[in-house]
Amino acid sequence: MGKFGRLDAGVQKTVSGRAYAYCSSVTDLTDEHMPPSSWFIDPKPDNMLTVPACRGCNAAFGRDDDEFRLSLGAVVGMDTPETIEFNRTKVMPGVIKNRRQTRQVLGSTRLLMRTASGASTFGEAALFRVDFGLFCRVGQRLARGLYRFETRTSLPADTPVEVGRVGDPAPYLERIFKGAKFREKGPAFAYWHVIVDDLPTHSVWLFDFYSWLFMIAITGGLIGNLPDET
């Protein structure tokens, strides 16, 4: 299954009949794009998803948004017109502006052999590893935000959220997400999710970034039921 991380749970709150995804603020409220709009190439999809959040939370997420965008650009590479455009318009401007972030990403690079369908080698490429703490924070935020979007409620404070990287999504799509609800927002992002009917805080989410980076998030402790990729 690989490495998983658990982060602190968020807080459930309702203000004037609205549940907020991240904090208990009742002032200076806004809608946050989920995922952040800066991870999408232009033209952006119609009807991008939003969840209610305060401006303070939005501002606090800014650094993670920037660092994950840079890391995502390195991970997805430049193998398709969409990933080329993403790197050209969304990643390179940040590389120029923030040399520290660039050094962090390049410092996690190693050479690997890339294979076609897990079989014949067809070349070498650089493998970029996203900082695991950043990876977990992004996954937890996506799970909580999209849970809020799908259910119109927020996960309770004591609900654990675990996050892991998926190399091959096929076992999950076949065994966990077969027939699951699916949403796609252009080439940049798609997700599948299953929420347990009689245990509504228990859910599993599979996030797809540019059909290259796959992330799974589990709320409520379902990790023992996931398929083994090996």
What are these model-predicted stretches?
Residues 59-95:
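Polybasic, low-complexity binding patches
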Residues 10-13, 44-47, 128, 132:
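Short, charged/polar micro-motifs that form catalytic or ligand-binding hotspots
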Residues 66-70, 101, 134-137, 141:
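Exposed alpha-helical structural elements
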Residues 19-50, 61, 66-67:
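Histidine-centered nuclease catalytic patch
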Residues 1-19:
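Short, charged surface segments at domain edges that flank catalytic/cofactor-binding sites
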Residues 90-132:
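Short flanking/linker segments adjacent to small metal-binding domains or redox-active Cys/His motifs
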Residues 54:
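Zinc-coordinating Cys/His ligand positions in small cysteine/histidine-rich zinc-finger domains
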Residues 120-230:
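C-terminal, charged low-complexity interaction regions
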